[in-house]
């Protein structure tokens, strides 16, 4: 009895050892290549081995061998069936998840995920592929423009965007402009807004159905664009063309774009303050900041905006107009003499400041923050000149710090003057590495080295980087523009080096009812005015011959309805601001591209038809 059992166990061991050896000698890559049929994977080696064993066995062992064979084959068949059933169910579940997710907004997806989590259901996470041809680090405007450019030149391209932001790629300008003027009570959920021309659109570049699953990306025949949201690249290995994510996963690439953007700067006075001050301070940048500030604006009695640049002035006007109905006090303070004092000449900066005040904002120029604390439940801001400001909430809009953490592991150069990754005129930092958007310090072949933090630059540089990643080898020559709207009535577009420290010449005329951002979008059909620009460089425009004349300085207190401001360096126009003049950017671009000296800029201003009714 015991002998027979021992013989049976020994026979079974002899038959299983070759099987284990057959499976184990394979490398992980070879095992992955094995057919998915579990019966084939196990039965064939067993059958061959057992045939050899049975041929040398006596009649007394045949019965046991046959029993063992039947047992093994039966177990293998059952296992294969279970494996096939499990695989089919997983595929069905994955298919249903993809179908049910199509057309959902990020908010609806988040709500669905939260509901699943509350019911104890495991929420599936999109997994990163191990390799992609095109890897884009960052999920902003530059990355999306690059993805679109890559796919335009290579329709079968597989593009992966890795974004730290939980949202799909979206445009930032409406966060401080149109969204605040929406009459939709659910605007923070829908993130849809009416442009100044009354047309409605979403803040997202594309709906969720536009994108493919990241884990399916390598297997899709015609390629596509996938987005991994809520993931951060923490390490860049340029030698092995590999990145590491904050969840530990690794991705190899062939071409890589760094479009990491920037982080809002804070004030040292706020950084030194306690946790309560920081919790009641908004560093405005993302969708989450808009949602949070919109809610806060309806709950507090006073909001103070620190910063007098584009973002600070736009938010001040938006909150000021909104506060009229709520009775909220809106304060704006900054160290310059007037709004946008670093950009506009002093007379226009002062006029802009009065415009902001007419929107119901208490504007405090020449204000330098010394400290911030808490007193009797209020935030107390102390200024260097002794003035004090009490408020319920602070919005800091004091600039952007480029995200350059990857420079350390990637061995990339940071520009000591402008910040950002230092790249050449083709936006390339290293072999197979390009940089675009706010984080790129690039060489402008016309104006020298620069770093620009505007939407249109993100579009232009992202598009160029995408072209060069597919072999175009083009330099950065297209001058990007930027614009700012102080509500639907006053706005301006600018291009080139726009710095109030440069000499300026302004030519103005009386505005008509059509000279405002609202009318501009009615003509162009879009509130994101860079999207309405054509690729033409106004090549047929002829600059009129100059006649010596002395430019007349604008009269203080004048109502600057519309006009052109030229910024000069060595008597050459290097920057232009179009004040309430829209859809004339190709003309301004050509003037800067020509780089000629002009004796009478009044003649040049005629190109913009500012005296037309």
Swiss-Prot record:
Tissue-level expression: Expressed in all tested tissues. Detected in muscle and skin fibroblasts (at protein level). Expressed in osteoblasts (at protein level).
Residues with PTM Phosphothreonine: 105, 521
Annotated effect of mutating residue 430 to C: In DFNX5; uncertain significance
Motif (Mitochondrial localization signal): 1-31, 63-89
Residue ranges of the region described as Disordered: 100-127, 513-554
Annotated crosslink Glycyl lysine isopeptide (Lys-Gly) (interchain with G-Cter in ubiquitin) location: 255
Impact after mutating residue 338 to E: In COXPD6; with early-onset severe motor neuron involvement; decreased protein levels; decreased oxidoreductase activity on cytochrome C; slowered reduction with NADH; strongly decreased NADH oxidase activity; strongly decreased NADH oxidase activity; no effect on DNA-binding
Residues the record lists as N6-acetyllysine modifications: 388, 593
Cofactor: FAD
Residue segments, region FAD-dependent oxidoreductase: 134-483
Gene Ontology biological process: apoptotic process; cellular response to aldosterone; cellular response to estradiol stimulus; cellular response to hydrogen peroxide; cellular response to hypoxia; cellular response to nitric oxide; intrinsic apoptotic signaling pathway in response to endoplasmic reticulum stress; mitochondrial disulfide relay system
Clinical disorder: Combined oxidative phosphorylation deficiency 6: A mitochondrial disease resulting in a neurodegenerative disorder characterized by psychomotor delay, hypotonia, areflexia, muscle weakness and wasting. Some patients manifest prenatal ventriculomegaly and severe postnatal encephalomyopathy. Charcot-Marie-Tooth disease, X-linked recessive, 4, with or without cerebellar ataxia: A neuromuscular disorder characterized by progressive sensorimotor axonal neuropathy, distal sensory impairment, difficulty walking due to peripheral neuropathy and/or cerebellar ataxia, and deafness due to auditory neuropathy. Additional features include cognitive impairment, cerebellar atrophy, dysarthria, abnormal extraocular movements, tremor, dysmetria and spasticity. The age at onset ranges from infancy to young adulthood.
Protein name: Apoptosis-inducing factor 1, mitochondrial
Organism of derivation: Homo sapiens (Human)
Gene: AIFM1
């Amino acid at each position: 009895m015991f002998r027979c059992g021992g013989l049976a166990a020994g026979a079974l061991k002899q038959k299983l050892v070759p099987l284990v050896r057959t499976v184990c000698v394979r490398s992980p890559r070879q095992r992955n290549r094995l057919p998915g049929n579990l019966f084939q994977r196990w039965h064939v080696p067993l059958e061959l081995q057992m045939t050899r064993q049975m041929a040398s066995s006596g009649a007394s062992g045949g019965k046991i061998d046959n029993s063992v064979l039947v047992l093994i084959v039966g177990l293998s068949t059952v296992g294969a069936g279970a494996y096939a059933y499990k695989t089919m169910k997983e595929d069905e579940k994955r298919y249903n998840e993809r179908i049910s997710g199509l057309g959902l907004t990020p908010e609806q997806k988040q709500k669905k995920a939260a509901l699943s989590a509350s019911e104890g259901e495991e929420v599936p996470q999109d997994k990163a592929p191990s390799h992609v041809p095109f890897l884009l680090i960052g999920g902003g405007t530059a990355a999306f423009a690059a993805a679109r450019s890559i796919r335009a030149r290579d329709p079968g391209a597989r593009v992966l965007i890795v974004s730290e932001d939980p949202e799909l790629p979206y445009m930032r300008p409406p966060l401080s402009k149109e969204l605040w003027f929406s009459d939709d009570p659910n605007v923070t959920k829908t993130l849809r807004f009416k442009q100044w021309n009354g047309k409605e659109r979403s803040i997202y570049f594309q709906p969720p159905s536009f994108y493919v699953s990241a884990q399916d990306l390598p297997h899709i025949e015609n390629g596509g664009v996938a987005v991994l949201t809520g993931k951060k690249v923490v390490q860049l290995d340029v030698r092995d063309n590999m990145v590491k994510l904050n969840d530990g996963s690794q991705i190899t690439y062939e071409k890589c774009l760094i479009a990491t953007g920037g982080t809002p700067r804070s004030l040292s006075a706020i950084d030194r303050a306690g946790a309560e001050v920081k919790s009641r301070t908004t560093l405005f940048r993302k969708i989450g900041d808009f949602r949070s500030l919109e809610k806060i604006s309806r709950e507090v009695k006073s909001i103070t905006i620190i910063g007098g640049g584009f973002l600070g002035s736009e938010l001040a006007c938006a909150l000021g107009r909104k506060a009229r109905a709520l009775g909220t006090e809106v304060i704006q303070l900054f160290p310059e003499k007037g709004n946008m004092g670093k950009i506009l000449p002093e007379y226009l900066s002062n006029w802009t400041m009065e415009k902001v005040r007419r929107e119901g904002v208490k504007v405090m120029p020449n204000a330098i923050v010394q400290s911030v604390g808490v007193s009797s439940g209020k935030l107390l801001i102390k200024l260097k000149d002794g003035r004090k400001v009490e408020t319920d909430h602070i919005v800091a809009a004091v600039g952007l710090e480029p995200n350059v953490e990857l420079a350390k592991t990637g061995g990339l150069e940071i520009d000591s003057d402008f910040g950002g990754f230092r790249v050449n005129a083709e936006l390339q930092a290293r072999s197979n590495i390009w940089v675009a958007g706010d984080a790129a310090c690039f060489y402008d072949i016309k104006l020298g080295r620069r770093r620009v933090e505007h939407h249109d630059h993100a579009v232009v540089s992202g598009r160029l980087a995408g072209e060069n990643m597919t072999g175009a080898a083009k330099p950065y020559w297209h001058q990007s523009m930027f614009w700012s709207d102080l509500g639907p009535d006053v706005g301006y577009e600018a291009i080139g080096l726009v710095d109030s420290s440069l000499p300026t010449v302004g030519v103005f005329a009386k505005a008509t009812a059509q000279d405002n951002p609202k009318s501009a979008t009615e003509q162009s059909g879009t509130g994101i005015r860079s999207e309405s620009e054509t690729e033409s460089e106004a090549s047929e425009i002829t600059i009129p011959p100059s006649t010596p004349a002395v430019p007349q300085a604008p009269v203080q207190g004048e109502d600057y309805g519309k006009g052109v401001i030229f910024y000069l360096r060595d008597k050459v126009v290097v920057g232009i601001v179009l004040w309430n003049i829209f859809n004339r950017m190709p003309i301004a671009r050509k003037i800067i591209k020509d780089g000629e000296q002009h004796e009478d800029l009044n003649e040049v201003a005629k190109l913009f038809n500012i005296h037309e009714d």
